[in-house]
Every structure is written in structure tokens, then in C-alpha cells.
Regions:
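Contiguous, well-folded functional domains in the mature portion of proteins
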Residues: 1-218
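Ser/Thr-rich, Proline-interspersed low-complexity disordered segments
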Residues: 220-249
Length: 250
């Protein structure tokens, strides 16, 4: 689909906003189940259960804390900061799966272009980053990071083609569309809202069909502030509006 705006300011593989391996993460001890957290509910948030076909609540295998990023470190683009512990103490979740199981797009009602609901911000063989906007940035809207997965070769090839062509277009996906598979007994996922890493265990936002299984309540976190945007490239071109390219079914 045509990219509407935004700019990473860096090649996607060099940006800690898209390539989660640059930030990294550490294991943490936490409750491995759905939780209730007070505060506003995210209307029409991506539903992680839909990453499985048919949708389900998987067993949670482990919890992690993603590292913050310090943009002021020298040389640019900065350096890894401390592990994120606020506003949420869990920011990456390992979920059980079956080796060879197909993985789908976490569903959302609001389309971004035609019938598409998500756009690929970054892809490599074992990592995928999706945004639920048409911005070439995670600063607005929802972003989902998948780690330790197998991205479909067709999707990866299309992403590399459009990335090399200047990112005026990027691959997009529909609800129910397969983008890859799990080749091991688990994979990891993180979810962000306007750049902030959220708690992926929260049932009122990411697992709404399973709220009856939420029996553990956590304290409401401090106010969540939008991310500090990554520095824009000084000569970043304005996104053009060419004929959209549709992602082939993997």
C-alpha cells in the first residue's frame, strides 16, 4: 500500500524502532496469564488471539522486558538504555505454539487502505514488525513485533523489493491473512501504542474475547506518555502515492 507519511530517519534494519534485536530484552519473573489493569480500554485494539488460526488463548511460556533506547548517545543513532519497567513491567511475551503452525495478523476492525488492516514496517527471516497505520514510523497507532518466527518467503521478498525502492510503498496484510509460521514450540510478541511498549497480557485490550478468564488484577500504571520520536532524516522525501501493491498470500 502507499506509505502515507512519517519517516524512520534510519534504514529499517538499523532502527531500534523497527528492528527489535537492536534493543534486545531480558527475562523477568511475572505472572504468566491474563491480567486486569485499570485505566482506559483501547477501542479496536489488535487482538493477539487472532495470530493463531483458529483464534485462541495460548499458554504463556515466559515474560520479558524490552530495553529502552537512548537517542542521545554518541555516535548516532544512540545506544541501548535500561530495561523498561514503567509504565509496564512486562513488555514482551513468549507464547506456546506447535512447530509448523501458521501465524496470522492480529485482527483489527479499522482498515488502513481498502481491506488491509496492517502494514509491514520491517521483516527479516525470523522477525516481523507490523504497524496498524500507513505511517513509516511507530510513533502513531499500534505496532506489533514478532520474534523467533519464520516469515513467509513471498512476503519477505516483497518487503525487500519495496524497501530497496525507497519505501514509498510497503506490503500490507488483511485480517485472517497468513504471514508466516512458528518453527519451534513458542514465539515472542510485543505490542506498542504510540511508541510505548504495552503489557501484552492485558485482557481488556489485546484479549477481549477471553476477559472471563482474567482473574488476576494489577495496579494501574502511571500515565503513559507517547514515545520520543526517532530523529528524521534531514533529506527524507515526502511519501508519494503510487499504485498500491498487494501482498501475495504466503
Amino acid at each position: 500500500v502507499p506509505v502515507e507519511g512519517g519517516s524512520l530517519g534510519l534504514p529499517a534494519d538499523k532502527s531500534p524502532d523497527t528492528n527489535l534485536s537492536l534493543r534486545g530484552y531480558r527475562p523477568t519473573t511475572a505472572y504468566l496469564g491474563l491480567i486486569n489493569i485499570g485505566g482506559d480500554t483501547h477501542d479496536d485494539a489488535p487482538q493477539l488471539a487472532a495470530a493463531f488460526g483458529p483464534p485462541r488463548l495460548p499458554a504463556f511460556a515466559a515474560a520479558f522486558q524490552v530495553y529502552d533506547w537512548n537517542w542521545n548517545c554518541s555516535p548516532p543513532p544512540g545506544c541501548r538504555g535500561d530495561a523498561l519497567t514503567t509504565p509496564y513491567s512486562v513488555t514482551l511475551l513468549e507464547m506456546r505454539t506447535t512447530p509448523g503452525e501458521q501465524l496470522l495478523v492480529p485482527s483489527r476492525k479499522q482498515p488502513i487502505y481498502g481491506s488491509f488492516v496492517a502494514m509491514v514496517l520491517y521483516a527479516e527471516e525470523r522477525r516481523l514488525t507490523l504497524t496498524y497505520t500507513r505511517d513509516d514510523s511507530p510513533a502513531n497507532g499500534y505496532v506489533v513485533h514478532f520474534e523467533d518466527v519464520v516469515v513467509a518467503p513471498e512476503l519477505l521478498a516483497l518487503y525487500r523489493q519495496l524497501n530497496a525502492a525507497g519505501r514509498k510503498e510497503l506490503p500490507a496484510l488483511r485480517n485472517g491473512e497468513v504471514w508466516g509460521m512458528a518453527d519451534k514450540a513458542s514465539f515472542k510478541a510485543a505490542i506498542r501504542d504510540r511508541g510505548t511498549f504495552m503489557d501484552p497480557r492485558t485482557c481488556k485490550d489485546w484479549w477481549v474475547d477471553y476477559r472471563s478468564q482474567c482473574t488476576v488484577s494489577m495496579a494501574r500504571p502511571a500515565a503513559v506518555f507517547p514515545m520520543q520520536p526517532s530523529p528524521a532524516a534531514p533529506t527524507a522525501p515526502t511519501a508519494a502515492m503510487p499504485v498500491p501493491v498487494q501482498t501475495p498470500q504466503p
